[in-house]
Amino acid sequence: MKTLIVILSFIFFSLNFTLNSQEISLHEQFNGRYDFTAIGNTLNLVENNSSTNCTILTGSSANLELEPTQNITAAYLYWAGSGAGDFSVNLNASIITPDRTFSFTYSSKLFFAGFKDVTQIVQSQGIGSYELTNLDEIDISEAYCSTGTNFAGWAIVVIYQDNNLPLNQVNVYDGLQAVPEAISIQLNNLNVVDVIGSKIGFIAWEGDSSLAVNESLKMNNVLLSNPPLNPETNAFNGTNSFTGESNLFNMDIDVYNIENTISTGDTSALIQLTSGQDLVMVNNIVTVLNSQLPDATII
């Protein structure tokens, strides 16, 4: 198989809406003995689709755990929420303003996300607790509360180097797109020499565990799942694959093993996301493929 096709399918609850967003594209590529992990947390006290309580916290924390052999190479902070935007937050003792911002409009309602390269902060602190605070400009008005679209959360994607790893190609993509827009990302000049350890991960906002109408994740027309966290019919359900959490209300930090859907010798990859009912905003995608490329050149 020379082309890798990933299809993320969701079902959207209305066909009468207006969508504006930024296309997901390659942000950075790492070639060598690299892998990734991710941490983060929601600010929602409950799933927004299951309660009339629209109160949202202004901060939350998560722990970064790494093995002694895993050395931090890069760290990227993403935060998002309902409303026009909050672009001044705190990560532990550091004031954070975004390097880039993203916006999305759905049925006249605004949503936002911010991105910050926090490599120096995370390299300096290392493992331990990270707390994002001062995310206090979230719109929880009736327009959002009554439609179950009020949310806020944050995540840090950490790329690390470990001499015990095989030679991998780690691609980090970002933007802010929501279903039902189709997303196509063509990856050329790949060199998959072994399928062991191949995986795809994503950070997505606003998914509901209670809305699961034909949600699916497919690769080469094969349904992927990570039971019990991510069943075939409910990919975006407020879970974290790294910690096993199932109460990450209205956000997902999920990873799927794709060893059985790719083959040694694959030279290109087409990642596609298509639409569904549950409002889901995809902010970040990470792929890990075994590769012999020796440097960090973007291809």
Feature locations, PLM:
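Surface-exposed, proline-enriched loop/turn segments that connect beta strands in immunoglobulin-like
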Residues: I298-I299
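Disulfide-rich extracellular domains of secreted proteins
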Residues: S21-P294
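Bacterial Sec-dependent N-terminal signal peptides
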Residues: M1-E23
